[in-house]
Regions:
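Short amphipathic helix-loop junctions that connect adjacent transmembrane helices
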Residues: 52-64, 253-272
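Pair of pore-lining "gating" transmembrane helices in MFS-fold secondary transporters
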Residues: 25-58, 230-251
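Cytoplasmic helix-loop-helix junction between adjacent transmembrane helices
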Residues: 127-163
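Juxtamembrane intracellular "pre-TM" segments in multi-pass secondary transporters
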Residues: 12-29, 211-239
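C-terminal membrane-cytosol helix-exit motif in multi-pass small-molecule transporters
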Residues: 176-177, 196-216
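C-terminal ends and interior cores of transmembrane alpha-helices
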Residues: 103-118, 306-310
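Helix-to-loop junctions at the C-terminal end of transmembrane segments
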Residues: 81-93, 180, 283-296
Length: 310
């Protein structure tokens, strides 16, 4: 089975430099399976936020111009918590960072539900910040999967976790559709409570991940960030990331609210976002081959062109 392949050592442990290296891949199969499931569950967090936050913001905001502020705060939370999440993983291990992130996932669901019940716009904004912190941790799942398997198994491990992202694109919108009317008249309150439950389930899955805590030797060395940031390739990559993420957020933020204001149902808005997220993750299965054949610059340019056309 494919899962068994992930657990097989790709190289003789005697060729490795560190004594702990033979144990590095001992739980490869279990780790990749858990990270894939967690990606599907935790990845639904961002989808729920994008599907509902602008609509809830429009209903709760003191001024309709602030309707999309909760999603902006979600993005700020993701950016602000990326480095702290990395620091926690570096000093205390990735599983600790994962559980801290899923803890934020539970909080966003509980606080958002309370905000809807109380009609508090600013509490809802605070909730989406925790959602951003949760999303920052979820972004690291794929890298953790790559690090916990032998080098020649990494593409397959990444494919598994990215497949979890495709499932997240289905779970998130369907979660909204199935739960948005569970607590009338508090529209979406049931959705946020369900989101908290899904985050707790993800925490239970991630609690079984067995990744080694980094040693001092692992944390030592490396180039200063200032040296890296001055490289043209780094600047190009960051610029492409900023532009593409800005445009993607613009589309994902406005689309659900615009669809509702055009008279379409919430179910239709959820379905539109579902296909958007599936299209985000599904190409990951063959993007690597395209980069190998055409080069990263051409593939990045094609991606920006597609975003512009959309």
């Amino acid at each position: 089975p494919i899962e068994d392949d992930l657990a097989k050592p790709a190289i003789d442990s005697s060729t490795l430099n560190t004594p702990s290296s033979p144990d590095l891949y001992a739980h490869a199969r279990s780790n990749v399976a858990r990270l894939t499931i967690a990606q599907a569950l935790s990845g639904a967090n961002a989808v729920v936020v994008y599907a509902t936050a602008a609509i809830v913001g429009n209903a709760l905001a003191p001024n309709h111009a602030l309707a999309t502020l909760p999603i902006s705060i979600f993005v700020v939370g993701m950016a602000a918590c990326s480095l702290p999440a990395g620091a926690i993983a570096q000093h205390y291990g990735r599983r600790t960072a994962f559980l801290a992130g899923t803890g934020c996932g539970v909080l966003v669901g509980l606080f958002a539900a309370l905000a809807v019940v109380l009609g508090s716009f600013w509490l809802f904004c605070a909730a989406t910040f925790f959602g951003g912190a949760y999303a920052a941790v979820v972004l690291s799942f794929r890298f953790s999967a790559a690090d916990c398997v032998p080098p020649d198994r990494r593409p397959r491990a990444l494919s598994f976790v990215m497949a979890g992202g495709v499932f997240a694109g289905v779970i998130g919108p369907q979660l909204v559709t199935l739960t948005m009317n569970l607590w009338p008249p508090h529209f979406f309150a049931g959705t946020y409570l369900a989101q908290a439950a899904v985050a707790a389930l993800s925490a239970a899955v991630l609690s079984g991940v067995r990744l080694p805590v980094p040693t001092r030797e692992d944390m030592a060395g490396g180039r200063p960030i200032g040296v890296i940031a001055r490289q043209p390739k780094f600047i190009t990559a960051v610029t492409c990331g900023v532009v593409s993420y800005l445009l993607m957020n613009f589309l994902m933020t406005a689309a659900p609210l615009a669809m509702r204001m055009c008279g379409l149902s919430q179910e239709s808005a959820n379905l539109g976002l579902q296909w958007h997220v599936i299209a985000m993750y599904a190409p990951s299965f063959f993007t690597g081959r395209l980069i190998t054949r055409f080069g990263a610059h051409r593939v990045a340019a094609a991606g920006l062109a597609l975003t512009g056309l959309s």
